[in-house]
Amino acid sequence: MKVALGFRPHSGWAAAVAVHADPTQGVLERRRVALADLPPPVQPYHEAAGLDPGEAAALVEQATTAAYGAAGAELSTLVDRLRAAGHEVVAAGVAAGPGTVREDLPLDRVLAAHGTLHAAEGELYRDVLVDAAGGLGLPVTLVPPREVPALARQLLGLDDGSVRALLTELGRPHGPPWTRDHKDATVAALLALDPQPVRARAGPAAAPSAAGPGRRPGAGRRSRPARHR
């Protein structure tokens, strides 16, 4: 059966699920995936804020390279396991916004404000997931977390209460923890299988590229992680 992966990233890790194309069939797998290898810090931009420019750039580069490597290894293991069990992994959804602070600002400006520090770290761990999934040939759909409830209602054709009940029930076989992170990741996976609601809300900019629905430019190129000017 076709399945999709769903992720809700945080600094250094992500909640991950694998979901059947038919949501009534439940969540196949729930796990926490590591997106950072030690010793590089899991919050490299925060750590770099107090360093001189050369040291800051080196730290961010080291942590970025480690994060891309960790994400690639984790997703490869997860996909291999699902495929070995007879599942066809066809897409991935990431519950994360489309910000581009890391691409748009030089490192010194990112490090100058608390808001851009947080934004850059969120984008880093989103980007490594998008890149790792793309490297495995999976089209990726980005789902802004604030839009998860509305998109879930539209996709499933249910009201808020029914959506919450369904998401709770889907996680019941796995037991606790089954948190909002896991539910957001589940919705992201379902939207990866049917991204039309995401495209409709986002407008023409969200139209699928040749690489697949919701893919960001450059995704899947682990040899070229985003670098600051």
Where are these regions (language model features)?
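Phosphate- and other anionic-substrate recognition elements at nucleic-acid/protein interfaces
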Residues: M1-A200, R227-R229
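Compositionally biased, low-complexity flexible segments
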Residues: R201-R227
